[in-house]
Structures are given as structure tokens and as C-alpha cells.
Amino acid sequence: MTYQEAFIEFMVRSGVLTFGDFTTKSGRKTPYFINTGNYKTGAQASALGDYYAACIHEQLEEAGGADLLFGPAYKGIPLVVTAAASLYRNYGTDYAYCFNRKEAKDHGDKGLLLGGPILDKDRVVII
């Protein structure tokens, strides 16, 4: 079984991927729905990171690498963290990661971007 097939089975087992008659916010009809809010455990987060890492690793080998992983707020934040950890653990690649805030803070770290800095020359993977 490929990691893609295993990932689909994992989403179904986790109650994240469901099948039926759904209508999206835009009014489009779809036979399936993905609700990532149904991931709720550390084991699921770890597995999710492993699936993302497998895909990213495969794609980056073909593309010649990357400099940074970016996870857009809000749902991309746990994805980028678990993917970066899994890439290091499973493949020995230690990517910097970064994510954004949707709102600026007036105390502490006031920036909108947190984590590794994004430089002009960086090749960035957006998760």
C-alpha cells in the first residue's frame, strides 16, 4: 500500500474523511467532506506528520530541496510543526519552519511571522 492510500484510510478511520452528499460554502456539491478538526490525539498528530513528511520528502527529492516550511494560520500551524518533526525523525532533514498569526499582538513577540525567518532567496514549502 502506498503512503497516499494509507493516508486516505487513516483519514477515514479518524472520522476526518466522510462520504455522502455535501454542499460547500460556495454552493458546490461534493460526494466527500474533510474535517481536520476531527484529529484529536497525539497519535493522530504524529501519524499526520509522518504522512505529510513522506509526501514532502518525495516531492523535495524531485524538486531539489527547500529552505523552509510554512504553515498558514490556523490549521497549517500544527501541520507544519508535525511535518518538520517527522521530516527530521524519519529522513534526517532539519528544515526551519515558520507560521503566521492572523492578528498582530501588542506584547511579547509582536511580529506576524513566528519561527524561522523567510529570506528573499528561500524556497518555501507551503503546507
Residue ranges and their predicted role:
Residues 1-63, 120:
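Active-site-facing substrate-recognition patch
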Residues 27, 69, 97:
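Conserved hydrophobic/aromatic pocket- or pore-lining residues that grip, position, or stack substrates
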Residues 36-37, 72-73, 100-103:
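Fold-independent oxyanion-binding glycine-rich loops
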Residues 44, 70-71, 106-110:
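Glycine-centered small-residue hotspots that permit tight backbone geometry or close packing
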Residues 62-75:
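Short glycine-rich phosphate-binding loop at a beta-alpha junction
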Residues 70, 125-127:
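Structural motif
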Residues 78:
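Cofactor-binding active-site loop characterized by glycine-rich and histidine/acidic residues
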Residues 81-125:
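Short, glycine/charge-rich flexible loops or terminal/linker lids adjacent to PRPP-binding catalytic cores
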